[in-house]
Amino acid sequence: MTMSASRRFALLDWAARHQAWILEDDYDSEFRYVSRPVGSLQGIDAGDRVIYMGTFSKALFPAVRVGYVVVPPPLWTRFLESRFAFDIFAPTLYQRSLAEFLKTGHFARHLRRMRSAYLERRDALLRGLDRHCGDLVEVHNSDAGLHVTVLLREGLDDQEVAARLGRRGLAAVPLSNCYVGPVRRQGLLLGFGCAQPQRLHAATRILGDVLRERV
């Protein structure tokens, strides 16, 4: 969920007043489909209270295994000491190759291509949900990222639905697994990043069949 501008500034103000640190994991921020990517907290933080983290594993491929942290100056030494204490850095060849990929503009072009590909997959998933699941689901949080949140009609059990999907070769995360407190709504997290549009459309047909079996 993307925070509103007022909430962002309120959080930064709280961190400054209490000398607290904010850990910002900018997960999947590159993949936004309805507008320009939203700026980071770190980019509007005048008080150096945000520790900004990211990875290239999602935008490129998992095997690259290179992430990064933008650390406020007061923490530079402590972070370097901690890093050296735990493990060595990513291989120099990986780092230099990635730096060249960024510097020459190839990464920006790659992101544009990936946004287009993931937008096509997201749209295929949304069309399939609308056609095959109808009023059995409510779709939320589809503007960015590589998954959508689907709330189920009252009376449907997301654990049971996910288990039935698993038996038919599909993976879905029950939303009830994600609550810290009491479960308020049953639902599913549906990923679309690694499937072609035709496969996603077929998967929504199976989901619709499973839901209707339980209604």
Locations of the language-model features?
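PLP-dependent class I/II
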Residues: M1-V215
